[in-house]
Amino acid sequence: MNNSHADVGLVIAVKRLTAAKTRLAPMFSARTREDVVLAMLVDTITAAIAVPALRSVLVVTPDEDAADAARQLGALVLPDPTPQGHHDPLNNALTAAEVVARRENTNVVALQGDLPALRTVELAEAIGAARAHARSFVTDRHGTGTSALFSFGAPLDPHFGLDSAQRHRRSGAVELTGDWPGLRSDIDTPDDVLALNDLGVGPATARAIARAQ
């Protein structure tokens, strides 16, 4: 993270592990689900932090376990300032993280924290493609969600949530069309987990899933 030519700050928002990925309940117990979610974050940060263009990785979260894991990997941590009951907690957290990231970076990327199959080269290539646009995004494998949102010299203006791909498109962000299967494979459902069999996952996620079997 000490590349003098790096000019991008990456932000990841993580909710409390006890409240994360409830749609995985048919596959994992509550305790195992927390372990898997944390492991996916570890693998995501590990892949991302090796991208040469990144000057910093900042995780915004209210969860101490997630914060500790992020720090151990060399990421910065911002306690989530979002008040309880906020109508749009994810995008509020990302906007708060963007403010901090822009203290040192003109360009900011918001990345999902549940990309256990992410490869460093995929994110590096996507950032390279994103440089041609003020704002751009990469959809998830279903084409409806957003795995990453990029801003180069422009406000991030995040619209994550239901139908986020369409919302980002309508906001003027350009859709990037590269072949980045790991970058597109965020995990929300048991079917998403099963789809990882064709891609492979990072070591932390592999261990967490193996312990659950």
Swiss-Prot record:
Binding site for phosphoenolpyruvate: 146, 161, 164
Reactions accelerated catalytically: phosphoenolpyruvate + GTP + H(+) = enolpyruvoyl-2-diphospho-5'-guanosine + diphosphate
Pathway of action: Cofactor biosynthesis; coenzyme F420 biosynthesis
Chain segments annotated as coiled-coil in the UniProt record: none
First-tier enzyme category under EC: transferase
Enzyme nomenclature, EC number: 2.7.7.105
Nucleotide-binding found in the keyword field: yes
GO MF term list: GTP binding; phospholactate guanylyltransferase activity
GO BP: F420-0 metabolic process
Keywords: GTP-binding, Nucleotide-binding, Nucleotidyltransferase, Transferase
Function of the molecule: Guanylyltransferase that catalyzes the activation of phosphoenolpyruvate (PEP) as enolpyruvoyl-2-diphospho-5'-guanosine, via the condensation of PEP with GTP. It is involved in the biosynthesis of coenzyme F420, a hydride carrier cofactor.
Name of this chain's protein: Phosphoenolpyruvate guanylyltransferase
Gene name of the encoded protein: fbiD
